[in-house]
């Protein structure tokens, strides 16, 4: 019997505003599938949707949101819509231009959260860098300038909150030193193989919510890894054992773990059954023993390396991009 959660767990932001702890990611959601997935997700109970112009599907998402609002399936106030400024629009005056384009595509008057997608910039004419000449260093275009553009978006009423993505503690501190508006959220890769414990602790200390992307792992990237000897998270006997004990799926355990440790999670799916299963993960409660077992899986195993940013000759290296 399908049981829809009466209410979704929420994360409290620095200003006491609430963000749903489980959302729907839309990266790699194909055109033609996104519309149906968004409508189905809203019917299930999802209210948090994570978008970005580089994903290439914001217009279709906008159509789905428009139709859901028109049909009375949900109100705008109930929704939490996140998008991101791409690396081509990091100059202060370009940030608001990019946001206005996103708002037109998603057919909304404002976002709930707008993020700097990456702590790296490249030429406006280059969507994905191919050579070192396509990139702009942080010395040429500091993140502090981009943050000023983000703040202008808040002052213009185009987004309620602003934040960052793929930022280290060091880069967060750099923004904080001159920020007039606080960082609300840092969105980073996080799962049992890559738990980001120190970053999470710093964010929580600073009242910055952490959103985990790739909370189920990122299998499509595993073949690109120099060492991918670890089993997929879905094949981990430890996680499977915990799932069996709770009569749950492995994905539900992974999502429940993320929520229970105080992060938001944004799994991607366009499959109706998985949409429901993922949503119901927010109702799963793991024991202290479960959480301890999952904590021991931390391997420092990052799937997303930002390889197109750290290409040969780039001003960005794996070391200075991630500050590791």
Q: Locations of the language-model features?
A:
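N-terminal binding-site loop/beta-alpha segment at the start of enzyme catalytic domains
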Residues: 2-79, 96, 216-219, 318-324
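Acidic (Asp/Glu)-rich catalytic clusters
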Residues: 14, 62-76, 103-107, 176-179, ...
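Active-site mouth loops of central-metabolism enzymes
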Residues: 20-32, 84-93, 135-139
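A short, structured active-site edge motif that brings together acidic residues
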Residues: 75-89, 113-119, 187-190
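CE4/NodB-like, metal-dependent polysaccharide N-deacetylase domain
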Residues: 95-116, 152-156
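Beta/alpha (TIM)-barrel catalytic core signal, keyed to glycine-rich beta->alpha loops juxtaposed to Asp/Glu
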Residues: 119-324
């Amino acid at each position: 019997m399908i049981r829809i959660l009466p209410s979704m767990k929420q994360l409290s932001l620095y200003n006491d505003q609430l963000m749903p702890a489980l959302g729907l990611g839309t990266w790699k959601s194909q055109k033609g599938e996104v519309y149906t997935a968004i409508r189905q997700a809203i019917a299930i109970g999802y209210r948090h949707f994570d978008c970005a112009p580089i994903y290439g599907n914001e217009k279709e998402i906008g159509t789905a949101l428009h139709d859901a609002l028109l049909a009375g399936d949900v109100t705008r106030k109930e929704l939490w819509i996140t998008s991101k400024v791409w690396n081509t629009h990091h100059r202060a005056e370009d940030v608001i231009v990019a946001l206005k384009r996103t708002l037109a595509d998603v057919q909304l008057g404002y976002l709930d959260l707008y993020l700097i997608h990456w702590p790296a910039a490249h030429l406006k004419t280059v969507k994905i860098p191919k050579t070192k000449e396509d990139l702009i260093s942080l010395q040429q275009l500091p993140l502090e300038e981009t943050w000023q553009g983000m703040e202008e978006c808040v002052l213009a009423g185009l987004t309620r909150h602003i934040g960052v993505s793929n930022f280290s503690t060091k880069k967060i501190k750099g923004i904080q030193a001159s920020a007039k508006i606080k960082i609300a959220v840092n969105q980073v890769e996080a799962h049992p193989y890559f738990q980001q414990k120190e970053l999470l602790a710093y964010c929580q200390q600073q009242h910055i919510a952490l959103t985990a992307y790739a909370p189920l792992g990122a299998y499509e990237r595993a073949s690109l890894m120099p060492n991918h000897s670890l089993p997929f998270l879905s094949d981990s006997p430890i996680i499977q054992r915990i799932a069996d004990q709770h009569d749950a799926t492995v994905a539900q355990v992974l999502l429940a773990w993320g929520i229970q440790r105080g992060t938001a999670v944004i799994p991607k799916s366009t499959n109706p059954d998985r949409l429901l299963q993922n949503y119901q993960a927010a109702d799963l409660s793991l024991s202290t023993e479960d959480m301890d077992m999952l904590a021991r899986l931390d391997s420092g195993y990052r799937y997303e390396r930002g390889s197109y940013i750290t290409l040969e000759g780039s001003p960005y290296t794996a070391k200075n991009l991630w500050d590791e």
